[in-house]
Amino acid sequence: MPQVSRDRDVDCAPMKNESVLFQPRTNQFCLLNATATFLWNQLDQPRSVSELADRLCQHFDSVMLAGATRDVEKLIEELRSLGYVVSSEV
């Protein structure tokens, strides 16, 4: 099952309910909302989309698994395309 984790070169600046990511290889910034920041914080080690979706549902009571899975897939794909996360096979 593919897993994803942070690119170790990316810097993260936490703010009140958000975070700003900086990818030094591309000089690109990315602003994360509270939900995306929660997921980013889970990526300190490799995790699967299903594991991230489960954690999201546990953290936010009103989130349903199907919606969480879609949202996680979308966020991970965007972060991967911008070089903020890396994938690995387990």
Give residue spans per PLM region.
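Long, charge-rich, low-complexity alpha-helical segments
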Residues: 25-90
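Long, low-complexity, charged/polar intrinsically disordered regions in eukaryotic proteins
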Residues: 1-27
